[in-house]
Amino acid sequence: MERTAIRLGGVELSSSVMNASGPHSAERGEIYELSARHQGALVFKSCNVAGLEAPENLKNRGVEHFAAIARELVPRHKVIIASVVGNTEDEIVKVAGILDRAGVKIVELNLADDYVMNSVAPFASYERLKALVGRVHGEIGAALAIKLPPKPGAIEAKTLANMLKEMGVSVAVCANDLPKDLEVDIATGLIKGGARPLSQAHAFWRLSDGVYDVVAVGGVNTGRDAYVAHLTGAKAVGVGSALIKEGAGALGRIDRELDGMLAENGKRSVNEIVGQARFEG
């Protein structure tokens, strides 16, 4: 929808609503159903070189499976975001390169999963993370996204944000872990209390200086949820639970609800509300 169209990491998307990597995004049939049912970007499930049978959340058929689907969908003007895991730096770099050459527009390094955290340990030090990001950046032409763990280890949030900016990372994928009792006046964007980071997504948006965009993942089940995520800094939202419960139609429903709320509040574009939350205190 025109009102929900955005530019994420320099890539034009027809909606700010997308699937979260994982649900309904691993098998050919479900990927094609998502592609047909929703106009926004399509996010692949995280993959490695040879595929995995476990853990269940990373079960996948391997990078060539996803690269083949990308090569089919990209000529049909589908914007694809591919997600990468691996248990070595070399594997992560290799997978990113294969997906990039298949034509995906954004390559996400899923550095948040325990599988990567416990093997590659990218957040063990600033130097380690910077070296990995630099290697991947040198391998791909697509925009680079980093999925951040809830607690990025030894690296402070401000230092991490500065590194994302310095290394040319286009997108930070963050948890939309807003307080359950958060009170937001949708019409004005006012939030009770003093200025404070409300979620990981909000915290990294505040540190971004507009250099990278933020995708908020989690807790988005309605158009209102998406609206609040946008108010607190998210350029786009990733939908998981609603997709599992409702199937592919959940994305279109949330997109339509968001579009309706934007219209009700006199907004011509979702871009008008990104980061516009204000504190009363």
Where are the regions a protein language model picked out?
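Hydrophobic faces of well-ordered beta-strands that scaffold small-molecule active sites
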Residues: 15-21, 40-45, 80-84, 107-109, ...
